[in-house]
């Protein structure tokens, strides 16, 4: 059967890559066309657009790129029509994918959505469009089942795809040592604009902790030059395509909010969650977003498990205080370890990619 899959960010590429492998295992004649990244292409899909051409974050940034966004939407529609998929699979990326879903429904296409938009955080009324346009919603967070139940919309919890990825990495991939010193991981994000804002603040920690080796996880879609310009003469390491190897040996991490916070927690690394965006975008977000926390770890656990330094709170002094606590407060580290274990078990031992592929293949076969 023919599968058209759309992911617009690095996290979606990771999820999509594992999904595509699972689809090929269950449907040996599968033909997959996608918008995504290197992982999806490596898994066996024909890559049409790379997410680095699509990833705009924040209200202001989206507005300034509206022409490119609408051009991509029109190109996507034409490409889907030409391909004639048995099922359209949308992975997160709601600003783009919900528009495509509305259009595709009018074309009488079968539509699966894997990784729900965070409608529980903001613009909750989008659920009405999801109910109208999406045939099968596959969620990855346990609390999303009850959220959608409020809207009388039955969804399928398949498990969190990161659990299976991290389990495989922990069990089967040996650690390659990065330094003789204990390591602190810096994950400044995958988009150029967020790296330019957060990495300089993270690098200010180097002088306070000379007994540690600071290692930056380079986003695969970003050039070396972006990082080297920011790093300057700082004595740090820059590694590419080694994020999990880095997390397996890190004593602590300074982590950009997003999927990386959950990955870091699943590897058991004490972390400080860092967020700093465009001032106008952040102000608008505070008016529209209705969640207590910014990190997935705290959202899932429904309590402040990890420290979040958001916008004006992300200062050199605050970051130093938070990192010192991670490295030196043994009671806090013990409590954090226990919370991380609870988090792991709350996400279950489901095989998300296999379960999602099964549901998608069933839908492609005409079973809604």
What are these model-derived regions, one by one?
Residues 1-368:
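Nucleotide-activated sugar donor-binding and catalytic core shared by glycosyltransferases
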